[in-house]
Regions:
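Ligand-binding beta-strand-loop-alpha-helix segment within the catalytic cores
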Residues: 1-20
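Anionic-ligand binding region
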Residues: 92-123
């Protein structure tokens, strides 16, 4: 027997265990047609109420990314994307691709900057979570037109076959693997590895900040 937890479930467990940062693959979100079906991942509501920083490769590209970002804003969740060498307003990543067509609400340059944001939120006692989007390494990213065509086909087939609710995501992911071949598998491994490295570096920088803060002498009033 094997299994895993959702981002929402992992956030709850992390908060109980005192873990401030964790890395994952891709965030759940608002499904296409979610304005009618109300099919919205619990990942989003948990980000609105549980103070844990999540590092992910954005959200899966077959979701409604625009509505997902709007939902996170409503929940009061910070969403920031690592610039990863880019300048200006950059896209929120969409799992297999570095761009999504939707601009990131904010941009973070370094792991140290992300750690400072996490610490500031903790000091202010703001209880919502934080999402730091880490774009897939450029050499492993899938071409946006290719993956969009595969997504459209997989989502259409899921609708035609009645795969809704909890059955939708597994079907779409499985179909995308068939349509893209080994490219999606290789991209999955690359983005998870990149997220783990990024998350570990953020956690290390946060630990350094916490240590330096605790060693500072108390100020007299």
């Amino acid at each position: 027997m094997h299994g895993g937890t959702t981002i929402a479930g992992t956030m709850v467990l992390a908060r109980l265990a005192g873990i401030r940062v964790f890395a994952t693959g891709g965030l759940g979100g608002v499904h296409r047609g979610g304005e009618n079906s109300m099919d919205v991942s619990a990942d989003l509501t948990e980000l609105g109420r549980t103070r844990v920083a999540v590092v992910s490769a954005g959200c899966k590209g077959f979701l409604d990314i625009g509505r997902t970002l709007e939902f996170l804003e409503t929940q009061g969740c910070l969403v920031s994307t690592f610039a990863d060498g880019r300048t200006g307003n950059i896209d929120f990543p969409a799992f297999w691709t570095r761009g999504s067509g939707f601009k990131s609400p904010s941009v973070v340059q370094t792991e140290k900057e992300a750690a400072a944001i996490i610490l500031a939120q903790e000091k202010l006692n703001i209880e919502s979570g934080m999402l730091f989007a880490n774009p897939i390494p450029e050499e492993f990213a899938l071409p946006l037109p290719d993956i969009q065509a595969a997504i459209e086909q997989a989502v259409r087939e899921a609708d035609e076959k009645g795969f809704t609710g909890s059955k939708n995501t597994p079907y779409v992911l499985g179909r995308l693997k068939e349509l893209t071949g080994d490219r999606a598998y290789v991209a999955n491994k690359a983005l998870v590895t990149a997220n783990l490295i990024r998350g570990a570096n953020v956690a290390k920088e946060l630990s350094n900040l916490l240590s330096s803060t605790s060693q500072q002498p108390a100020k007299s009033l």
